[in-house]
Amino acid sequence: MGEWAFLGSLLDAVQLQSPLVGRLWLVIMLIFRILVLATVGGAVFEDEQEEFVCNTLQPGCRQTCYDRAFPVSHYRFWLFHILLLSAPPVLFVIYSMHQASKEAGGAQLAPPCARGRAEAPCSPCALRARRARRCYLLSVALRLLAELAFLGGQALLYGFRVDPHYACAGPPCPHTVDCFVSRPTEKTVFVVFYFAVGLLSALLSVAELGHLLWKGRQRAKLLPPPPPSPSLPSQRGDPDPFGPPAYAHRSPAGDSEGEGGSGHSKASLATVRQDLAI
């Protein structure tokens, strides 16, 4: 149970970035899959090979028939299913933690746009938020693909019913051998339940994917246009190409004023450069 608790804590961190539909998917994942499989599934399928009985004493025949009846154990198939479904959300959590650590380390070096104008479409905060939304959208899409792939695999491998009787023929069995499965009704109920949970999870993933795409379009419509690039106001008119050069009328007092104006222009250039760097 320690491994399940660790996986549950990682998945629980996803709800901070998830909408309501994503949180419903997380509840189904934690309760109806991880909890049920860890408590009930192990008890139902732990002795399936030991209780798989065939009416023959031929060495190796029972093991071969069991392998033909169940190419992959139900329990191990569902374990791999849960691990693969958990991979995209866990990777998104790792990405979010990495971005949070980078922001915490560079908070003092953040430009003014990131501190005072985070709603600007070109600000670093807006870019980071857009990048996080795209990563979450990708994780939901990968989760949906994994869900559909495993639902198809379960239907092809096992179907929806565990038969109590299995007729096995072929080497090393000398003839057609009758084999019997333990607790077939209980296993059938569990197989149908797990498939229904998978369908519900896939529907929630489709709904969440559609919700995220719709929210992205609405956000793009409401996004304000980027502000125009700032430019330095002209202090003087255009020089006369036929007039005397400006330095011909310079006076000592004008030189001192020019030095002050030069310092002011440098300060303005520094301010504009800082704004343009945002």
Curated annotation (Swiss-Prot):
Cellular component, GO, one term: gap junction
Gene Ontology biological-process entries: AV node cell to bundle of His cell communication by electrical coupling; gap junction assembly; negative regulation of cardiac conduction; negative regulation of cell communication by electrical coupling involved in cardiac conduction; negative regulation of heart rate; response to glucose
Stretches for region Disordered: 223-278
Localization, UniProt: Cell membrane; Cell junction, Gap junction
Main localization of the protein described in the UniProt heading: membrane
Topology feature Extracellular, residues: 46-76, 158-188
Short name of any one Pfam family annotated for the protein: Connexin
Membrane topology: Multi-pass membrane protein
GO MF entries: gap junction channel activity involved in AV node cell-bundle of His cell electrical coupling; monoatomic ion channel activity
Cytoplasmic side: 1-24, 98-136, 210-278
Keywords from the UniProt entry: Cell junction, Cell membrane, Gap junction, Membrane, Transmembrane, Transmembrane helix
Stretches that traverse the bilayer: 25-45, 77-97, 137-157, 189-209
Domain of life: Eukaryota
Record-stated family: Belongs to the connexin family. Delta-type subfamily.
Binding partners and assembly: A connexon is composed of a hexamer of connexins.
Role: One gap junction consists of a cluster of closely packed pairs of transmembrane channels, the connexons, through which materials of low MW diffuse from one cell to a neighboring cell.
Protein name: Gap junction delta-3 protein
